[in-house]
Amino acid sequence: MFLAETELITGGVSMYPTLETIRQLAQTKEYRRIPLCRELYADRYTPVEVMRILRKASRHCYLLESASQTEVWGRYSFLGYEPSMEITCTDRTLKIRTTDAEGKTEETVRQVTHPGDTLREIIRKYKTPVMEKMPPFTGGLVGYFSYDYIKYSEPKLKLEDREQQDFRDMDLMLFDQVIVFDHFRQKVLLITGVMTDDLEASYEKAVKKLEEMAQLIRNGEHMEFEPLRLHDQKYEPKFPERKICRDGGESQTLHQRR
């Protein structure tokens, strides 16, 4: 774990690590991405409120909570938006969609034997150090692997009669901007990456990006959602178990797609 000295810039904004620390880490040639963090007080915001702002500002976003087996409440809430890469794989067809800083997108499609080989390349390319004072996740891949993903490791396994659903074998996104609620310290941590290829310019871009993130949280527009309404005439025939529950034949029924 690397020390992250606090640096105060104009206006008393707390950011870390220092540019000198980032230079030292870059000289090791071990990391291509160094996380840069800016702190805000969390007394004015909640994870759900920020999620509504991100949902309005970005096509893709997420909210993940952390909790160990010994905790009732997790220390961290992780949020992210504007992924720089979208990676999906279905039946060995791998699609990668990248988005640059100007919003220009590019998509590649190819056949693969195992998508894990591509994922390992991406992880190596964006290898990030663990920094003191920062949470365990400071950016990276977020998404899911379906049950069907096992077929890439067990090629002899035959998956027959697969339901035609919207689920892909793998659906991941690469997030560089991360917003973390540290509930223990009552702080909001804004995190983005400094790429070591062009360190000085990347550092300046990262500082500007952190300011944009802070302004988005403070002044961003909230997404408004319509309330969910289920009409009895349309949905009741799909749930005949309701009568069975009333009659005492079942205590609970959980409906799911797969």
What are these regions (language model features)?
Residues A4-E5, W73, E132-P136:
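Exposed boundary/loop context
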Residues R120-M134, E241-T253:
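Short, hydrophobic/aliphatic alpha-helical segments
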Residues G11-K56, H60-C61, S66-Q111, Y147, ...:
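Extended accessory regions or peripheral subdomains of proteins
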Residues F2-S14:
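Short, Lys/Arg-enriched N-terminal segments with co-localized hydrophobic residues
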Residues P115-E132, P155-D166:
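Short acidic (Asp/Glu) patches
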